[in-house]
């Protein structure tokens, strides 16, 4: 069984900054794919509460399946304002999508972050354990 991950990648033009139309125009702006080894590696942060872990997975599936959520860094807070179940066409970027999923799963807003400070901000919330860097043989989920 493959491990599936979800993420916000780029807008309908293949850009990562701004200028896209709200909502997912291509079905690939915010979507799921098989887990892969990223060139920069992965840090694994595991929810301390199994219920939160399950809700995180549910949240990402909901967000990735919601065609009202697209990608635009300059409009990244739309998903925080409207939530992952939004009926309003809105935007996110990779870090604001993670934040919105944490809010859905835990009921707690861990605060604003971007990919450069994501790990320490999320860990400061007390909701997650730092499992370190992903490596071959690492168990992602028991």
List PLM regions with ranges.
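N-terminal capping segments
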Residues: 1-112
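Activation targets extended, charge/polar-rich intrinsically disordered C-terminal tails
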Residues: 96-142
């Amino acid at each position: 069984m493959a491990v599936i991950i979800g993420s916000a990648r780029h807008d309908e033009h293949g850009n990562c900054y701004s200028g896209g139309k709200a909502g997912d125009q291509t079905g690939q702006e915010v979507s799921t794919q098989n887990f892969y080894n990223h060139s920069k590696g992965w840090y694994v942060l595991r929810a301390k509460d199994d219920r939160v872990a399950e809700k995180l997975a549910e949240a990402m599936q909901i967000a990735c399946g919601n065609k009202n959520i697209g990608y635009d860094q300059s409009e990244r807070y739309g998903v925080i304002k409207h939530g992952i179940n939004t009926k309003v066409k809105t935007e996110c970027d990779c870090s604001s999508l993670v934040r919105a999923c944490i809010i859905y799963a835990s009921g707690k807003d861990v605060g604003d972050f971007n990919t450069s400070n994501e790990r320490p901000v999320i860990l400061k919330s007390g909701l997650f354990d730092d499992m370190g860097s992903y490596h071959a043989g690492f168990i992602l989920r028991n």
